[in-house]
């Protein structure tokens, strides 16, 4: 006689607020509605949003096999994948969590470097309203800061001084 394995409820990504309405299935599940992946191209000095990164399907990542050792991709083009979480306070929405993960891509050999555990942990920290950009180079911080500011001045203005001085220290 075979033992039936219990079906466990794993990690759920849901579209709406899990705490709305009844207290049944989905309560306590994680909503990714308010987080966006922003790429910073270090060499081109540009930033852009690519929602595909939520599932490692961004234009940067497509067709690339990622390796856990940076040394295996010596000629990789450097990128920062930045998890940006938006929250709302009385005055309005603001950039609440911003965390940056390193990534390199060498299209010629279809290989790249990224630490998946680091990406997952930093996404979680962003959702927990943390600002972690200390590993970024100053130029990339400036590119990200200008991008976030230009994207929505109100969001930027309502954000923490910690974020503003971490990304654009000369403006504060």
Swiss-Prot record:
InterPro entries in alphabetical order: YwhD
Pfam family, any one: YwhD
Organism domain of life: Bacteria
Designated name of the protein: Uncharacterized protein YwhD
Provenance organism: Bacillus subtilis (strain 168)
Source species taxonomy: Bacteria, Bacillati, Bacillota, Bacilli, Bacillales
Gene transcribed to yield this protein: ywhD
């Amino acid at each position: 006689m075979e033992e039936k394995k219990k079906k466990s409820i794993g990690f759920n990504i849901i579209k709406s607020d899990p705490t709305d309405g009844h207290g049944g299935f989905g309560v306590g599940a994680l909503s990714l509605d308010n987080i966006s992946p922003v790429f910073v191209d270090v060499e081109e000095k540009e930033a852009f949003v690519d929602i595909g990164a939520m599932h490692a399907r961004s234009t940067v990542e497509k067709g690339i096999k990622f390796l856990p050792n940076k040394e295996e991709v010596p000629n990789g083009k450097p990128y920062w994948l930045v998890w940006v979480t938006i929250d709302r306070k009385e005055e309005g929405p603001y950039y609440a969590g911003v965390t940056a993960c390193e990534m390199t891509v060498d299209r010629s050999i279809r290989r790249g470097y990224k630490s998946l555990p680091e990406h997952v942990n930093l996404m979680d920290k962003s959702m927990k309203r943390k600002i972690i950009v200390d590993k970024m180079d100053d130029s990339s911080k400036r590119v990200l800061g200008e991008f976030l500011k230009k994207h929505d001045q109100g969001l930027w203005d309502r954000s923490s001084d910690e974020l503003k001085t971490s990304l654009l220290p000369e403006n504060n």
